[in-house]
Amino acid sequence: MNIKTLNGLTALVSLLVILPAIAGAETRELLLAAYSVPKEAYEKRIIPAFIRQWKQKTGETIQVRSSFAASGAQARAVVGGLEADIAALSLESDLQQLVKAGLVTYDWKQGAQKGIVTTSIVALGVRKGNPKSIQGWEDLTKPGVEVLYPSPKTSGGAMWDVITVYGAGLNQGKQKGLAGAAVDQHAADLVRRVQRNVKVMDKSGRESVTTFERGVGDVIVTYENELLPRIKQGR
């Protein structure tokens, strides 16, 4: 897998809130409800480090269970009754669902980082050797090029993907000397032309990457942090 980092990319954010503790628990156990992409980072690094730090700080041993799904689906699950103690989602609108449901009892934006715990950018992942010669966003619209990104109906990452394509279209329009509504029309047209080449729209960013690794598609639009570890592993 190769990576193409292009101009006109949109920053991605991971947003976190601490939900009210559930009374009456017999053991000190926390449930993390998070969007799917940072699964390995949480399970291999962040959660073990938190458990060690908490033990050193308080002397208390805790256990952390985790649930990973597309950001929008995860938000609906928590509102619907999933008893999460911590929610890490990829869109502010998903977190606001928890706020409206009365599940967040403090101003989650009040900290120095405004609730944002990680950032990344949108990038393009291509097959080894880049056989379709993908160099820019226009290449995603060419006949015969199969594109992958998840469904914006369920995936927060997919919304960032689409916004990034739109932003690239805005930049293109301005570079061509367009102005006003013509720039917006150019950007919307780029989104439509890319969408026509989308082969599969999975429920989450992680599922989309898995589909790409199974040999489906020529190029994937996803988080850069999803691509870099795979490139290092020669995948």
Predicted regions and their residues:
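Bacterial N-terminal signal peptides that target proteins for export
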Residues: 1-11
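Bacterial N-terminal signal peptides
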Residues: 9-20
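Short, solvent-exposed loop/turn segments at the edges of secondary structure
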Residues: 11, 90, 117-121
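Stable alpha-helical elements in mature extracytoplasmic
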Residues: 34, 38, 42-46, 70, ...
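Alpha-to-beta junction loops
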Residues: 81-87, 144-146, 214-222
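Ligand-binding pocket segment of bilobal, Venus flytrap-like solute-binding proteins
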Residues: 173-235
